[in-house]
Every structure is written in structure tokens, then in C-alpha cells.
Amino acid sequence: MHKTITKTALVLALVSCKAWAYETKMPALLDLVAGIESSHNPQAIGDSGLAHGEFQFHRDAWQQVSDLRAKQGRVAYPYSDAHNAVVARGYAEDYLTIIAKSLTAKMGRKPKAWEIYAAFNRGVGGFKALGYRFDNLPSHTKRSCTKIATALGETL
């Protein structure tokens, strides 16, 4: 689900990490992702025990955000806080921002919110392997991307 992001993506995210959040509909995207991933349940455990919390973080994705936060001099939290709704939401915002920056670099344009979710769900490399195309996504990811695009007024 949440594949490892390269160190290059982390470096890109260090440069104005929060800029993307202000240019898009981040609060709405966060709400949609939490609804899709866990029905807004901070105690959720999925993916055979590998995904935790409202945003269904895997340990490696959580660690990527912790590493970024440490480099930025920000508080990094233990993986057990994936079940803390406030902490997990902050981590999800950072992680979606990392993904957005990575997709921007790879796609040569700012990604749509549904594309960010597709990369969140499939991994950035997994989404790249699918040619960044909606039509190539698995049906369950297509349904979620359609929900996000519709809610945020985006085209697929």
C-alpha cells in the first residue's frame, strides 16, 4: 500500500513542504482519505495488521515522515501515535505533501488530488508503473479516486 518514497522525494519535500497544502484542498483531501481508508476510525488496523490508524499508515511510510520532521527540526512521533487522530492527521498532511512533490517532479506538473491518492494507495512507484493513468488502476482504487475527484470538482 504505502510504498517507500526515495530520499530525493524527501529532499524535494524539505523545500517548502507546506506550500502544496495551501494551493489545494488539503483539509478536504485529508477528510476524504480518512473516510476511504478507515471510515474515520483512528483505532483501525488493516492490511493484515500492517496498516494502522485513520489513515492506515504502514510503518515505513510513518518513518519517512518522522525522518522528514526530524530534518526540519519538528517533532517526530512514534508509530504507536498512528492511532492518535491529531498526530496522524499531521503526518498524513506531510505524507500527502511528500507524494505531491514527488509526483510534480515526475509528471512535470502539479498532480490532481485523485492522483495523489492513487500514489498514496499504490505507492509512487506503483502509480508510475501504471503510467499515472486512471484507466490502469485497480477497480477499488478507481472507485476511491472517483469519489475524491467528484468531491473536489476534478476531472479524471
Name each model feature, range by range.
Residues 111-156:
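Catalytic and substrate-binding regions of cell-wall glycan-acting enzymes that process beta-1,4-linked
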Residues 2-11:
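Sec-dependent signal peptide recognition
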Residues 25-41, 92, 116-124:
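Short, functionally critical alpha-helical segments immediately adjacent to catalytic or ligand/cofactor-binding
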Residues 59, 63-114, 119-128:
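Alpha-helical segment that forms one wall of the substrate-binding/catalytic cleft
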Residues 16-18:
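N-terminal signal peptide c-region/cleavage motif recognized by signal peptidases
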Residues 32-74:
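Secreted/periplasmic proteins that engage bacterial cell-wall peptidoglycan
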